Structure formats: C-alpha cells, structure tokens
C-alpha cells in the first residue's frame, strides 16, 4: 500500500463531491495535485496543494476552497485531524488505526513492500561501464558501474522490464594497438628480448599471460605469419582475455550485466548493420553529401575538408550535422553509434539509458538526435553523466596513478574497503556532482559512515529477534502473526517510525521517475537514523523497548515493527547492490 497514492485518490474523491468542482471538471487539471509529506512533520502526516492549484480555474480563494475540501476529508474515518496552513496548503493527520493497518500491510508484503507497477509494460535498456577492453577496470569506472547497476535494479523494482547492457568497444584502432602490444608479449614468451615497451603500445604486465597463452597454443607459428594473418587471431584472444578480466573486476563490485554487445558485430558481413541504419536515415531524408565547415576549437577526428556523407542531425536537435561516411568510403565511429541505437530500438526498448563519464558530455546532443532520427521520436533516450571521483585517505588526496604509471584499479579499491562500502558511497551523492571518496571514512564504524550506519540498523533489527528468542525460548512467530498484533503499536514514537517506512514506496517511484538512485541511499540513511533513535529511546524509556521479557504480546507486536524496518532496509540495500548483514563484525 502506497500511503500517498491512497490519499491522493481520497482527496480526488472528496473533490468530485464538491458541486463547483463537478461543474468545471473538464477545465481542471488534477495532474497538478501533489500529495506528499509536509516539510515540517509537526504539521501532519500528509500535505496537499489541491486547493492552491484548483482555486484559480474555479474562480475562488485557495483558503476558501481548502475549507470546503477539509469538510469533506473530515468525513473520512482514517483522518484524525485536518487543517489549512499558509495560503491554502492542507495538512492531514492520520488516525492510529490507519497506521496500524498500513503496518500490517507492510509486514504482509515483507521485502516486496514498495514494489511498484509504475513501469509496467515498458522495456528499458540501461547501458553502463562499456569501458574499452584494453585492460583492467580503473577506479574511474567505479561510479558509472554502480550508478548504472543500481538504477537498473531500481527500475526493475518499480515494475519496468530492464536489461543491463555493456557495449564492447572492440572495433576501433585502439584494439589494433592492443593486439600489437600482446604480440610483443607473445614474442617475449617465446624467449625474445623485447626491451622497453615502445611508446604508443600498452605497457601493462596484465598482457603477459595473454602472450604466454598464445605461445603455449601456437608456438612459433604466429611469429612466422605476416601481421594481416596473426592480427585476427591475436585480437580475438586478447579481447576474450580482457573481457574475462573486466567481468571479474565488475563481479568483485557485485555488478553483473545481462548482455555484452560487441561493436564488431555491427561491422560484420560488410558492416551490414551500419549500412541498414544509414539507409533508413536516407529514406527519411536525413542523409546528404556535403562538406562541413571547420568547427570552432579543436577539430574532431571525423572532420574533413572534403565531401562526406552526413547525417542532418541539426534537424533533430544537434548543434551540427555529423559525418557518417568519410571521403575514403569508411564509416565513422558515429555511424556505428547510429547502428547500435537502431539495434536497441529494433529489440523493442521503449527507453535507452546511457550512463557515461562526464567527459562524454559532448555526446549527449548527438545521441539525442540519433534517437529522434532513428525512432521518429518513439523511443526515449536519457544520458546520465557521472562526475569524477577523487580519492582521499584521512582527508589527504591519494594519487590516482601508481609508481608504475598504472591507474589505481577498481579491484584495488574493492579489496581495501569492500564492495559494499564502494557501492553505497558511490550512490551517496548525485551522479552529476563530484564525489570525494575517503578510504578512512568509509571503513570507520560511526554515524558519519553511511554504509556502516545503514547496515548496522539491519544488523540491530536481527539482534532484536535473537534477544526475543533468548527471552521467550521457543519464540518463532510468522509475519502473519506479526500482522495480527499491530494493535499493540500506538506510541507516537512508534508511529513516527511507521511513517518513515510509509515513505518508501513514494521514494522508489520518485527515484525511478527521476532516474536518481542516490535518493534511495539518502532515504535508507534517514530510515536507519530513525530506527537508531528509537532504539536509543528504549534505553531511557523501558516501555519503548522492542523486547519486554515480561510481556510476550507486546514484544510480538514490536517485533512486527522491527520486521517491517528490516524488510525495507533489506529491499533498499538490495537495490543499491549492498548486503544486509545479520550482524556486524
């Protein structure tokens, strides 16, 4: 049950009973009515702007309209009190019985509480990470990996059909350079002295095992081949090895994709997929031959002072038209982007989400233009840009590169602080804002460490059940039994905790609609804070303690409340990709 959806329906029902509203119903936009928690909890449990947004089209005063609405709402047995504030806001305080029924519904739903049908029938592709397969993941990839993965989990929880995708950039010139780097390691494995790695090649030792495996399987045969013969063999082996490494890196962060899409498939069979995509745009009138004027600033790689085949992307929102085919007849990298989007659209996705680094900001308009041109505006495209992560240790900056010249890897960070700390902290700031990651801060056991604070709340919930079993021996109560004892929950402090739990479905939907998974991380911290505060009250007020060894019935009722808290924490942490431990060690 979504408290705010429920009361939105009740408020609209009350409005429909007002004569003036019925008379002008066709002129009114009920979609502008907001039902949400009041900014100040002391004002009530639910607030609405209904009178504010409807007064003008109804030709009346907001406060006067609010008084009429309030009179209708007072007839609702679940409304304990209702009042008007300021220019016409309506604040509603709910009856204890409503909170108790809501708690029973939460307990009955368990970890499914908060699931939504918001995205029902909509298919979404979330593409994230998509790092070049040229080496291990570095720390710069962490944030996009976590944001993309958590967003996909969030959308799935909100009812969308979601596929997590990784685009393997395995068709560019950087792959040729990588293959030549591996071939050098292959020669080294055969016993050749290769000396210092030449400038322009990849120097990392992670390529040594790939060269050794080629030497073991092919002996000197590759060495005796010209480059055009050994290149495809070495490329395939190298890309496979790099993707194994990348998948292992991502798995260490609890990131798992459904699809790994190879760019090379777009170039297969004479680049049939790219040709088809360009032909479709041509049919729609978006393709022409021409020469682009030199853009201001640094010239892009695909600019030529010659006639090229161009995408008329300025007609669909881009800053400039984009080359598809160079003057020599070869396809641009952008042409592959067009074909890739068409592939996604043809797979039936209603929305494509790209999670990219902030350095890809210049790609946004061209990708949006591709979406409009390819889908005729039928498919939605969203690009989320992730700002940089800066590493610190006890407040002091940590160099992002090692003495060897290699970057700090994703695996380095995960092995030092754990995947839970990395994931939750990467979500604890909006993706469009820079993030400071302090190794010391994310491992300390304090309120200042969000991941510890939230996980500790779940562990405390589990400890309550252990205490109850110790107090009552064979205590083994099912959620169904918990739900039958909610009448024992009525203290204002307990109801405040229920109210915080009641925000969860709204947070899920709001975060999914805005595609902002950090909202969920913030909410989990707030919920944990509310639970810890209630726990601490029990130290000074014995009547609020979860376990009363002299009152089994009261204990079972409060265990139901703890069960609901634990369920929401577990669900929320699962969406973020973070564990919900039963105890903290």
Curated annotation (Swiss-Prot):
This is Arginine--tRNA ligase. GO terms for biological process: arginyl-tRNA aminoacylation. Pfam families: Arg_tRNA_synt_N (PF03485), DALR_1 (PF05746), tRNA-synt_1d (PF00750). Belongs to the class-I aminoacyl-tRNA synthetase family. A motif ('HIGH' region) lies at residues 131-141. It catalyses: tRNA(Arg) + L-arginine + ATP = L-arginyl-tRNA(Arg) + AMP + diphosphate. The lineage of its organism: Bacteria, Pseudomonadati, Pseudomonadota, Alphaproteobacteria, Hyphomicrobiales. Monomer. Keywords: Aminoacyl-tRNA synthetase, ATP-binding, Cytoplasm, Ligase, Nucleotide-binding, Protein biosynthesis. GO terms for molecular function: arginine-tRNA ligase activity; ATP binding. Its EC number is 6.1.1.19. Its main location: cytoplasm. GO terms for cellular component: cytoplasm. NCBIfam families: argS. It is found in: Cytoplasm.
């Amino acid at each position: 049950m979504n408290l705010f959806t429920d009361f939105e329906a009740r408020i609209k029902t009350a409005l429909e009973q007002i004569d003036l509203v019925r008379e002008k119903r066709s002129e009114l936009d009920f979609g502008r009515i907001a039902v949400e928690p009041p900014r100040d909890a002391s004002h009530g449990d639910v607030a609405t702007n209904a009178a504010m947004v409807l007064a003008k089209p109804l030709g009346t005063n907001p406060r006067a309209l609010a008084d009429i609405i309030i009179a209708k709402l007072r007839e609702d047995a679940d409304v304990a009190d209702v009042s008007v504030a300021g220019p016409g806001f309506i604040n509603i305080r709910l009856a204890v019985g409503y909170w108790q029924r809501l708690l029973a519904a939460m307990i009955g739903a368990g970890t499914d509480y908060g699931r939504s049908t918001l995205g029902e029938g909509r298919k979404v592709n979330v593409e994230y990470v998509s790092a070049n397969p040229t080496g291990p993941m570095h720390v710069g990839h962490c944030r996009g990996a976590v944001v993309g993965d958590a967003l996909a989990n969030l959308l799935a929880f909100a009812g969308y059909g979601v596929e997590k995708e990784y685009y393997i950039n395995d068709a560019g010139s950087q792959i040729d350079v990588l293959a030549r780097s591996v071939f050098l390691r292959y020669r080294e494995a055969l016993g050749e002295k290769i000396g210092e790695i030449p400038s322009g090649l990849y120097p990392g030792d992670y390529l040594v095992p790939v060269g050794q495996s080629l030497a073991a399987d092919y002996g000197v045969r590759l060495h005796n081949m010209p480059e055009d013969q050994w290149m495809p063999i070495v490329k395939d082996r190298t890309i496979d090895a790099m993707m194994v490494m990348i998948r292992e890196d991502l798995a260490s962060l609890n990131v798992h994709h459904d699809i790994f899409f190879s760019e090379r498939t777009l170039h297969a069979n004479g680049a049939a997929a790219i040709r088809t995509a360009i032909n479709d745009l041509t049919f729609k009138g978006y393709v022409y031959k021409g020469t682009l004027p030199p853009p201001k600033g640094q010239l892009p790689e695909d600019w030529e002072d010659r006639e090229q085949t161009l995408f008329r992307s300025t007609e669909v929102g881009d800053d400039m038209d984009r080359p598809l085919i160079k003057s020599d007849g070869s396809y641009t990298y952008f042409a592959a982007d067009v074909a890739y989007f068409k592939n996604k659209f043809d797979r039936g996705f209603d929305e494509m989400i790209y999670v990219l680094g902030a350095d890809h900001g210049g790609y946004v308009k061209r990708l949006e233009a591709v979406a409009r041109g390819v889908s005729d505006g039928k498919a939605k495209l969203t690009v989320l840009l992730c700002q940089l992560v800066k590493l610190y240790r006890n407040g002091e900056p940590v160099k992002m590169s090692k003495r060897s010249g290699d970057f700090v890897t994703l695996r380095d960070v995960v092995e030092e602080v754990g995947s839970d700390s990395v994931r939750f902290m990467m979500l604890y700031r909006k993706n469009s804002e820079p993030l400071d990651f302090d190794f010391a801060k994310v491992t300390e056991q304090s309120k200042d460490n969000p991941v510890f604070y939230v996980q500790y709340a779940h562990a405390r919930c589990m400890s309550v059940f252990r205490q109850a079993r110790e107090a009552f021996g064979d205590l083994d109560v099912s959620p169904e039994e918990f739900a039958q004892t909610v009448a024992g929950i009525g203290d204002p402090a307990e109801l405040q905790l229920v109210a915080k739990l009641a925000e969860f479905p709204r947070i899920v939907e709001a975060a999914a609609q805005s595609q902002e998974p950090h909202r969920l991380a913030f909410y989990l911290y707030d919920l944990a804070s509310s639970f810890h505060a209630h726990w601490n009250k029990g130290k000074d007020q014995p009547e609020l303690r979860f376990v009363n060894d002299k009152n089994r019935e009261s204990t079972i009722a409060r265990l139901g409340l703890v069960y609901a808290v634990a369920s929401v924490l577990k669900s929320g942490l699962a969406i973020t990709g973070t564990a919900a431990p039963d105890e903290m060690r």
